[in-house]
């Protein structure tokens, strides 16, 4: 069996991937404030296949609680409208020619708390992903040390670097959560 290689850069990249994934997931949560990323999960039936909203229209934010969607192809307006209505966002599109407007309703306290719970769930998934990457890195180091490829001192030093990368990623995840929580709870 080939000896596994230890690459701290790869471990950091994988941890950063978990943070990026969390940011994307949290970006799609409704906060009562209009953001183009709110429509990222919506798929539109276009030209015989399912496409992301960004590939059929431009989404802008003319007001804090209003999204404006400029559909590029006039024939796609009804499909975009249908995709928005069928999404679980609970938004009601208003169409004016090739432009669709979405007013983002105020969220009540109960809905805000539900969104915070969902944000915590996404955050815990990201923390678990980071911990899995840490475990993989530490397992490789232990195997290398056991096989005599690195000294015990090197194993301990590199394990400390893996732990530092883990702590940095977890702190970044906590920061992303705190920011999103503040945004959700803001009235």
UniProtKB/Swiss-Prot annotation:
It is found in: Cytoplasm. One of its GO terms (molecular function) is ribosomal large subunit binding. It comes from Methylorubrum extorquens (strain PA1). Responsible for the release of ribosomes from messenger RNA at the termination of protein biosynthesis. May increase the efficiency of translation by recycling ribosomes from one round of translation to another. The lineage of its organism: Bacteria, Pseudomonadati, Pseudomonadota, Alphaproteobacteria, Hyphomicrobiales. This is Ribosome-recycling factor. It comes from the Bacteria. Belongs to the RRF family. The gene is frr. GO terms for cellular component: cytosol. Coiled coil: none annotated. GO terms for biological process: cytoplasmic translational termination.
């Amino acid at each position: 069996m080939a000896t596994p290689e230890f690459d701290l850069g790869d471990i950091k990249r994988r941890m950063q991937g978990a943070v990026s994934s969390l940011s994307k997931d949290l970006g799609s949560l409704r906060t009562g404030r209009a953001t183009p990323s709110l429509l990222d999960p919506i798929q539109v039936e276009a030209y015989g296949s399912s496409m992301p909203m960004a590939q059929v229209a431009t989404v802008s934010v003319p007001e804090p609680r209003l999204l404006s969607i400029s559909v590029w192809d006039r024939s796609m307006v009804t499909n975009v409208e249908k995709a928005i209505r069928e999404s679980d966002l609970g938004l009601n599109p208003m169409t004016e020619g090739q432009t669709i407007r979405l007013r983002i309703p105020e969220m009540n306290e109960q809905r805000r708390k539900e969104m915070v719970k969902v944000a915590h769930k996404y955050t815990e998934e990201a923390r678990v992903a980071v911990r899995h990457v840490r475990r993989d890195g530490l397992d490789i180091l232990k195997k290398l040390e056991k096989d005599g490829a690195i000294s015990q001192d090197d194993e301990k030093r590199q394990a400390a670097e893996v732990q530092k990368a883990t702590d940095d990623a977890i702190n970044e995840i906590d920061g992303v959560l705190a920011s999103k929580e503040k945004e959700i709870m803001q009235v």
